[in-house]
Structures are given as structure tokens and as C-alpha cells.
Curated annotation (Swiss-Prot):
Record's keyword terms, sorted: Cell membrane, Chaperone, Cytoplasm, Membrane, Phosphoprotein
Keyword Cell division recorded: no
Main localization category: cytoplasm
Protein known as: DnaJ homolog subfamily B member 4
Function: Probable chaperone. Stimulates ATP hydrolysis and the folding of unfolded proteins mediated by HSPA1A/B (in vitro).
Localization: Cytoplasm; Cell membrane
Domain J: 2-70
SUPFAM superfamilies: Chaperone J-domain, HSP40/DnaJ peptide-binding domain
Any one GO molecular function term: protein-folding chaperone binding
């Protein structure tokens, strides 16, 4: 007795072309050897491919419906259109059928974050144990009770974290970064891998703070057994020769002498846009003293038209030695406490 292709796919004899495609998709995924480790999986995978190749082809299906498998393969279906007898022989490579069905793309990509029909996310797929329970089929290929207990969900790999170092000038003005990553991708056979490079474009917005995260969902390595990891870039400030950052404020350290700290001085304060602002200090500069220039800091992330402040801190340089006469003058004029 020949093979019952309809039974193999789990469909009725009058099934539509769309029903045949859906059935093949479910059964091929179910019995793919990379997903199903049972001893019979390879043979079932091959049978499913052969059944689909016959039933999805109108001429083969018509002959099969009339004469069965023996007639299809034995030439009972008349001529092939060129004067010869039509005979069908399965090519023997179910993986080729599998790859062709998925259009040459990654055949497992439905598990890796793309959207499926009906708006359902692929990371909602149930793939461990009974990997195709979401389709309403049991492991033997026939419809099952939808109230049965579902298996566990496919897990996503942990995020891959990269530091993205940016200068204060880039934060001040905003910029575009292009980051090259290499990741593994499944080949159409669903088993082997290739290494693929990709350029990820990051728009650095004005005023972004250190620690800001930019996430590229599921751009990590592909495997048949997990959802690709998210690629995450975390903003990290580069050291600056003049400024330190304090949120949206920037800090400039002015170095002055002890005499200037006591007697007053004038300094030129640089700004982020390359200008300098003159500042006169008449007060005695005490430890921790700051001056503030409003609106000369970094843009606010949520309102880049407004900016933080430029803070001036003072670093007083003390002499290594002073003469005895200078000490006497200081003792005479400086308060004891």
C-alpha cells in the first residue's frame, strides 16, 4: 500500500492549497532533526517534504488522487507533455524543500523576534518539548486538545553590552555613530552558520547622559535553540582635557596662585563652543568655592534648546617654600584664626 500524503500532513483530502502550506510548515518544523531528536524524526521530516512536493503541485496531486503513490511513481498518469510518460521521483533532500519553502531566508527566523501572521510575536512561540503546541497539533502530527498543558517558552540570550565612548563635544552638538558588529546567522538549511557583519547606526542626541542605553533588539547570534540577544550600547563619557561633566552642567577647574586666591585675580573661562568668558574674582577664594555661568553647560536631554550651567572650581597652588621675612609679613597681617 502506498503512502497516504494527506495523512502524513494531517489534512483532509479536499484540503486547499493554503491548508497544505500551513500543514507542511507545522509538520516540517515539528520533525526537523535540529529541533526533534527522536530516532524517527529524520524519516518523518523526509516524508513530510515528499508529501508537500506532491500535494502542492496540481499535476502531481491530480495523478496521486487518481492512482496513488504507485501510479504517480510508476507512470500511470499519462504523458509528461513532451511525449514521454510522467513519472515522479522524490529528489531525496528534505532540507532543500525546507529552505525553498522559506524563500531562502533563515528558516527558523519565526523564532527570533520577527512578527508572524496575526500580529503574534515569535518570542511567544512555545518550542521546548512540544515545540509546535501553539499550532494545535500533537507530536504525532494530528490535531490535539487545545486545553492540554503547553510547554515552556524559548528563552532569549542575555543582552550583549558594549560601551560607547563619546566626547563632550559630541554630546553638546549631537552626532551619528556607526558601529560595526559581527554575528552568527543560520544558513537556509537551519543547521550551519555563517558570520555576518552589520553596521548599526546610532543617533546620539544632544545632552544624552552617561549611562543612556541604546538597544538593538535581537541583533545577536542566531541559534536554533534560543532567541538572539539584544545588542545594547551604553553611553560613556570620554575624559576631556578641560571639563568634567556633572549631569547637564560642566565643570572647569581654574588654577590660581595663593596670592591670587587672597588678593583677587582675573581669569578667562573657556566654553564648550570655543569662546572664552572673562571673569574677575575680588573675593578671597576659599576651599570649595564655585562660580556659576548660567546657560553655558550641556543641552538638557528632554529640552535641548535649554542648557545647564558652566561651573568654575578653583585649585589654589601653594608655594613649596617661602622666606623667613615673608613668613613674618604673613604672621603680622593674617588673622590667627
Amino acid at each position: 500500500m502506498g503512502k497516504d500524503y494527506y495523512c502524513i500532513l494531517g489534512i483532509e483530502k479536499g484540503a486547499s492549497d493554503e491548508d497544505i502550506k500551513k500543514a507542511y510548515r507545522k509538520q516540517a518544523l515539528r520533525f526537523h532533526p535540529d529541533k526533534n531528536k527522536s530516532p524517527q524524526a529524520e524519516e518523518r521530516f523526509k516524508e513530510v517534504a515528499e508529501a508537500y512536493e506532491v500535494l502542492s503541485d496540481p499535476k502531481k496531486r491530480e495523478i496521486y488522487d487518481q492512482f496513488g503513490e504507485e501510479g504517480l511513481k510508476g507512470g500511470a498518469g499519462g504523458t509528461d507533455g513532451q511525449g514521454g510518460t510522467f513519472r515522479y521521483t522524490f529528489h531525496g533532500d528534505p532540507h532543500a524543500t525546507f529552505a525553498a519553502f522559506f524563500g531562502g531566508s533563515n528558516p527558523f527566523e519565526i523564532f527570533f523576534g520577527r512578527r508572524m501572521g496575526g500580529g503574534r510575536d515569535s518570542d511567544e512561540m512555545e518550542v521546548d518539548g512540544d515545540p509546535f503546541g501553539a499550532f494545535g497539533f500533537s507530536m504525532n502530527g494530528y490535531p490535539r486538545d487545545r486545553n492540554s498543558v503547553g510547554p515552556s517558552r524559548l528563552k532569549q540570550d542575555p543582552p550583549v553590552i558594549h560601551e560607547l565612548r563619546v566626547s563632550l563635544e559630541e554630546i553638546y552638538s549631537g552626532c551619528t555613530k556607526r558601529m560595526k558588529i559581527s554575528r552568527k546567522r543560520l544558513n537556509p538549511d537551519g543547521r550551519s552558520y555563517r558570520t555576518e557583519d552589520k553596521i548599526l547606526t546610532i543617533e546620539i542626541k544632544k545632552g544624552w547622559k552617561e549611562g543612556t542605553k541604546i538597544t538593538f533588539p535581537r541583533e545577536g547570534d542566531e541559534t536554533p535553540t534560543s532567541i538572539p540577544a539584544d545588542i545594547v550600547f551604553v553611553i560613556k563619557d570620554k575624559d576631556h582635557p578641560k571639563f568634567k561633566r556633572d549631569g547637564s552642567n560642566i565643570i572647569y577647574t581654574a588654577k590660581i596662585s595663593l596670592r591670587e586666591a587672597l588678593c583677587g585675580c582675573s581669569i578667562n573661562v573657556p566654553t564648550m563652543d570655543g569662546r572664552t568668558i572673562p571673569m574677575t574674582i575680588n573675593d578671597i577664594v576659599k576651599p570649595g568655592m564655585r562660580r556659576r555661568i548660567i546657560g553655558y553647560g550641556l543641552p538638557f536631554p528632554k529640552n535641548p534648546d535649554q542648557r545647564g550651567d558652566l561651573l568654575i572650581e578653583f585649585e589654589v597652588s601653594f608655594p613649596d617654600t617661602i622666606s623667613s621675612s615673608s613668613k613674618e609679613v604673613l604672621r603680622k597681617h593674617l588673622p590667627a584664626s
